[in-house]
């Protein structure tokens, strides 16, 4: 008997485009749907524009994720620099 696993959001592509491409699409869509920043849920408004659903604050981030890896590195560096000055 066949395995009845759920296909996820990229299941709409069927057997097309390859396994890796479908997996990347599924990961991006999962990150976009369940995006949080500091515990608050955020929603994607446009390319790189996100809005905090609880406070209404708009901010920029990555195209598909609210925080990019480079942005997280910069934020960590700023926290370290500010912590050293005090």
Swiss-Prot record:
GO terms for molecular function: large ribosomal subunit rRNA binding; structural constituent of ribosome. Keywords: Ribonucleoprotein, Ribosomal protein, RNA-binding, rRNA-binding. GO terms for biological process: translation. SUPFAM superfamilies: Zn-binding ribosomal proteins. It comes from the Archaea. The keyword ATP-binding does not apply. The keyword Cytoplasm does not apply. GO terms for cellular component: ribonucleoprotein complex; ribosome. Residues 59-86 are annotated as: Disordered. Binds to the 23S rRNA. PANTHER family: 60S RIBOSOMAL PROTEIN L37A, LARGE RIBOSOMAL SUBUNIT PROTEIN EL43. Part of the 50S ribosomal subunit. Belongs to the eukaryotic ribosomal protein eL43 family. This is Large ribosomal subunit protein eL43. It comes from Natronomonas pharaonis (strain ATCC 35678 / DSM 2160 / CIP 103997 / JCM 8858 / NBRC 14720 / NCIMB 2260 / Gabara) (Halobacterium pharaonis). The lineage of its organism: Archaea, Methanobacteriati, Methanobacteriota, Stenosarchaea group, Halobacteria.
